[in-house]
């Protein structure tokens, strides 16, 4: 869990991910509480997997995404179509994905203002 929503602890994600790499371990992070509220760049943080839920940054409920680093070795457990780059068969809710995308753009565009509000409080 990157950010704990109850006690506010923020895990030093990059440091922990680098430790995992040192020992050859794969790392998954629950970033549900941090994406859209905290600057994250998965090209600089070596996590292998991360989970995100759109409703946590004012996006539609019932949609999210899984970050899966190329070369992680994860393979599909559900056979079928080639959706989700062959990782998950099924029809994507395009309207919900579009809503999530827009909500995430708006959340990151307003990140500085949200930080000011938090500092004020």
What residue spans do the PLM features occupy?
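Pyridoxal 5′-phosphate
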Residues: 1-121
């Amino acid at each position: 869990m990157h950010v704990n929503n109850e006690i506010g602890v923020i895990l030093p994600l990059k440091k922990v991910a680098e430790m995992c790499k040192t020992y050859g371990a794969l790392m998954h992070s629950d970033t549900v509480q941090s994406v859209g509220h905290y600057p994250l760049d998965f090209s600089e943080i070596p996590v292998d997997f991360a989970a995100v839920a759109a409703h946590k940054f004012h996006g539609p409920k019932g949609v999210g995404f899984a970050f899966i680093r190329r070369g992680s070795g994860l393979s599909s457990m559900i056979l079928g179509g080639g959706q989700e780059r062959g990782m998950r068969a099924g029809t994507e809710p395009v309207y919900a994905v579009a809503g999530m995308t827009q909500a995430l753009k708006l959340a990151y565009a307003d990140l500085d203002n949200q930080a000011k509000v938090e500092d004020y409080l």
